[in-house]
């Protein structure tokens, strides 16, 4: 493995369009694809690219994120040298500054950057789903002689950037004087003084910046071609390991074109849906075009279509819940749903 790059995951962003899913967790900790969290994709991409030092800068509701990542063992980042670093900045929440961006958080922990041995830094958010080889980005960056390389996909920024660590230190030192608060501001407003290059990523990618996009991307994973683009045997996506028994299918259990994690009990019908670990589907229940997160219970005779049910929620027997792909109906984490609701 090379050790030319350090990884920086900016988890300071709050996106209102994701609000129902992030009331009790950071965006990076939102469950995705049956057994993962959103942060797993960029973190695994970094590790698979030989990055041995990764710093995560959280801001909101980060307890579940810390619990998920732990020591970094599942990503081979529990190291004596380098490894996984977690840098919250609670003082900034009460600083009184009009705007607090990522650079303010980086400045609070500037020693991490000053002590880093890596020549280059990759800055990424924690909510872009992709499986990218940052080594390839680095090679292109060096070949083109760029100051900053921005990774894009089909005309859209993936909010991932590669630059020299020394330049990043300069940007952090000067951000107040120049009025930029994150690398995004630098790219948008100060590109004339820097050489900005673009790297076009050709694999599957999705920036999860709304409930609608979360739902759409989850449904896209049911397409085998999409799944195979994202989950590459040579570049696996790592996550927190949990031991669960195999899923149990009852006599009336029926599953079509769905993703079912371990530990589930299926006694009804599941079609075109994503079920996380330890979900229970009652007898006669019908679940279509829906996302059911871990440890949820769906009562007998329920009908769900176009629904996202957050972790540890319960839907009582006979309840009908219907949403649309543009506006899925959401049952919040840990709640009990006992009404018949359609959209």
From Swiss-Prot:
Keywords: Glycogen biosynthesis
SUPFAM superfamilies: Nucleotide-diphospho-sugar transferases, Trimeric LpxA-like enzymes
Transmembrane segments: none
GO molecular function terms noted in the UniProt entry: glucose-1-phosphate adenylyltransferase activity
Domain of life: Bacteria
UniProt GO BP: glycogen biosynthetic process
Signal peptide: none
UniProt function note: Required for the synthesis of glycogen.
Recorded family membership: Belongs to the bacterial/plant glucose-1-phosphate adenylyltransferase family.
Record protein name field: Glycogen biosynthesis protein GlgD
Species this protein is from: Geobacillus stearothermophilus (Bacillus stearothermophilus)
Gene: glgD
């Amino acid at each position: 493995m090379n050790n030319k790059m350090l990884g920086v995951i900016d988890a300071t962003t709050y996106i209102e369009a994701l609000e129902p899913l992030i009331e009790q967790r950071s965006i990076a900790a939102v469950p995705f694809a049956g057994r993962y969290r959103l942060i797993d994709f960029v973190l695994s991409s970094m590790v698979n690219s030989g990055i041995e030092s990764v710093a995560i800068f959280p801001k909101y509701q980060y307890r579940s994120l810390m619990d998920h990542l732990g020591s970094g063992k599942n990503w081979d980042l529990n190291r004596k040298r380098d490894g996984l670093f977690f840098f919250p900045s609670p003082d900034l929440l009460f600083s009184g500054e009009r705007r607090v961006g990522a650079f303010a958080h980086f400045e609070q922990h500037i020693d991490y950057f000053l002590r880093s041995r890596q020549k280059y830094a990759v800055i990424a958010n924690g909510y872009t789903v992709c499986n990218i080889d940052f080594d390839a980005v680095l090679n292109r960056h060096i070949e083109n002689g760029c100051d900053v390389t921005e990774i894009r996909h089909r005309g859209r920024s993936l909010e991932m950037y590669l630059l020299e660590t020394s330049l990043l230190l300069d940007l952090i030192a000067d951000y107040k004087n120049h009025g930029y608060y994150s690398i995004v501001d630098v790219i948008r407003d100060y590109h004339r003084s820097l050489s900005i290059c673009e790297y076009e990523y050709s694999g599957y990618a999705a920036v999860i910046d709304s409930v609608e996009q979360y739902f759409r991307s989850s449904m896209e994973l049911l397409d085998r071609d999409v799944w195979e683009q994202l989950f590459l045997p040579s570049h696996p996506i790592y996550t927190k390991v949990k031991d669960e028994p195999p899923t149990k299918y009852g006599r009336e259990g029926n599953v079509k074109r769905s993703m079912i994690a371990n530990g589930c009990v299926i006694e009804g019908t599941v079609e075109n849906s994503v079920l996380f670990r330890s979900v229970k589907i009652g007898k006669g229940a019908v679940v279509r075009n829906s996302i059911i997160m871990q440890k949820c219970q769906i009562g007998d005779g329920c009908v769900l279509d176009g629904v996202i049910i957050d972790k540890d929620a319960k839907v009582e027997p006979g309840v009908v819940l219907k949403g649309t792909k543009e506006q899925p109906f959401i049952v919040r984490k840990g709640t009990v749903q006992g009404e018949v609701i359609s959209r």
